[in-house]
């Protein structure tokens, strides 16, 4: 039996004084994708932030390789990519410099050639020197997702990664996630857009 890498044990989450979810338990092994569904305000983002270690659960625990996150915070962050609602890149920098700066902050040694290759894969090679503010929302989202190509991390936590993507972009994202799974990677995501995913588990919030 494959040992779980990420475990949520009897998790509860709150926002303000409102209880968003309670008694959530699941385990993720290499190669799995967990899809989180629910209405707006049901706690999907709170759950993802809790799994990433950015929010403290109201109850329960999150384990990585069988140990609590608080006991291995630095190691866990080196194995995680968290892509939130926001794009997370600077409007005044171009896409190339944005990704180089983001990689440096994340502690990922990448070359300019690697970043250019990632931008080419997401269809932004010709726009790599444009100020980020001049790109469309879909192009900005693709630039943000290009980080997944640069960071060799086991776990991807993606909050609405298909936002602003067209049909081509959504199909590319589904293929990218499938490749990550085939290499033993793990994914936790929320998405309002249907993606062609090999989903192993589903969590329904507010059910």
Curated annotation (Swiss-Prot):
Family (UniProt): Belongs to the ABC transporter superfamily. CcmA exporter (TC 3.A.1.107) family.
GO molecular function terms listed in the Swiss-Prot or TrEMBL record: ABC-type heme transporter activity; ATP binding; ATP hydrolysis activity
Lineage: Bacteria, Pseudomonadati, Pseudomonadota, Betaproteobacteria, Burkholderiales
Protein name stated in the entry: Cytochrome c biogenesis ATP-binding export protein CcmA 1
Record bears the keyword Membrane: yes
Catalytically driven reaction(s): heme b(in) + ATP + H2O = heme b(out) + ADP + phosphate + H(+)
Binding-site residues, ATP: 38-45
UniProt-listed Gene3D superfamilies: P-loop containing nucleotide triphosphate hydrolases
Domain of life of the native organism: Bacteria
